[in-house]
Amino acid sequence: VMSRAAEVTLAHETDLKVEDVRALADRVHAAADIAAPLSSGSFRTLGMVVAPCSVKTMSEIATGVTSNLLARAADVTLKERRRLVLMVRETPLHLGHLRTLTKLAEMGATIAPPLPAFYSEPQTIEDMIDQAVGRTLDIFGLDWARVKRWGRDVGPTK
């Protein structure tokens, strides 16, 4: 599920086209398709990652007042007590944002801003992205070969 805002961000920040990203997915659902399977708690998943997560989407999820499939699926993920990871990248954050993030964490969401992990000694932007992806997949118990581990690949005992 890709929101219209995500499509705009993709075009502005990368050389990728929406079709390129959709080609990576096993299934694609339109953001307006609120009858898609993932809008129901009976559709089983390991959880959900919203990346990047806008403040608008974050706020919709926190209130349960959802306007599209992305926010609805995240809301369902929380109500079903599944893992929900929000990669909120807004900065700086005001008190209202912080309170909303706190509310989401209390509801069971994991807040994982896509920040660079400089301990992993990134050489490229792709290295920074790989590390953020790997740490996010860790939350689901999934391995990503490109993530650098402290003590194994980097750090004083490497």
Model-predicted segments: where are they?
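A cross-family phosphate/adenosyl-ligand binding-site feature
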Residues: 1-85, 91-158
